[in-house]
From Swiss-Prot:
Sequence positions that bind carbamoyl phosphate: S57, T58, R59, T60, Q84, R108, H135, P136, T137, Q138, C274, L275, R321
Gene Ontology cellular component annotations, sorted alphabetically: cytoplasm
Top EC group: transferase
Gene that this sequence comes from: arcB
Keyword line: Arginine metabolism, Cytoplasm, Transferase
Protein name, UniProt field: Ornithine carbamoyltransferase, catabolic
Record's catalysed reaction(s): carbamoyl phosphate + L-ornithine = L-citrulline + phosphate + H(+)
Family recorded in the similarity comment: Belongs to the aspartate/ornithine carbamoyltransferase superfamily. OTCase family.
Claim: Cytoplasm is one of the keywords in the record: yes
Biological source species: Burkholderia mallei (strain ATCC 23344)
Amino acid sequence: MSFNLHNRNLLSLIHHNARELRYLLDLARDLKRAKYSGTEQPRLLRKNIALIFEKTSTRTRCAFEVAAYDQGANVTYIDPASSQIGHKESMRDTARVLGRMYDAIEYRGFSQEIVEELAHHAGVPVFNGLTDEYHPTQMLADVMTMREHSDKPLHDIRYAYLGDARNNMGNSLLLIGAKLGMDVRIGAPKSLWPAADFIAQCEAFAAESGARLTLTEDPYEAVKGVDFIHTDVWVSMGEPVEAWDERINALLPYQVNRKLIESTGNPRTRFMHCLPSFHNCETKVGKQIAERYPHLQDGIEVTDEVFESPRCIAFEQAENRMHTIKAVLVSTLGGI
């Protein structure tokens, strides 16, 4: 079966099949090797890419900018403070304007409906840099990182996600594992599982790929024998402090600490995090939480002990954001 990623949107990974995902992963590997060896060939000369950020970012913005520059493309960073988006101009009109000036558009923001609307009206490829529901560019980086740190084929890799699984990370890790035939475990309170219809959709993908999907409220069952443990922050700066109590109390059993990671029974288990991480109280939010919950001063979703240990590969994971995003740009705009 042939496929063509030229001028394709990247909105959720739902519409990408396993062969296309593997191609992007292989291309990212090749582009990474070329960058390291100094043999990279620019394929995006004179291409222009708009980067819309309604949510702040470090890794996503830097990854898109460096990936584009490496390949000879130009980027324009657009945020709400420096544009009319949402103030005097709708996303539909913004899409129709930018689509006439740019070769592609990246969007990082809130509802999935917004990036879908952008894609519908822009007339050029649109890339989802993160929405409340999905984080597809992070998933490519995560799977690339797991491949690099395992001698197993993808079908045999086992990984768990612990924490609030209703968010973009929980949804997306379940989805990409289902697409690629992997062994995926979700460990979370049942009230924080992905939506039932989304789980059913992933189970249908798993039936085609041979993936094994497990959702459990027992964190130790979730991580038994896994090769990788993923987590994400439990609270966000936009949430009121009063809302933290219920979330933290519900998720405390799912904290990634030495006891939990050793319970895997696998001395090679690695820890992964999309970042930023509240593994200590050196940040504004971390300090606020530590003051309110003194027992979490050494880490919230993950302890500082685990985060600073050799098991943690979060920074390799962060670097791979750039290589996988570059693969998306090259395959979409580079004509290969």
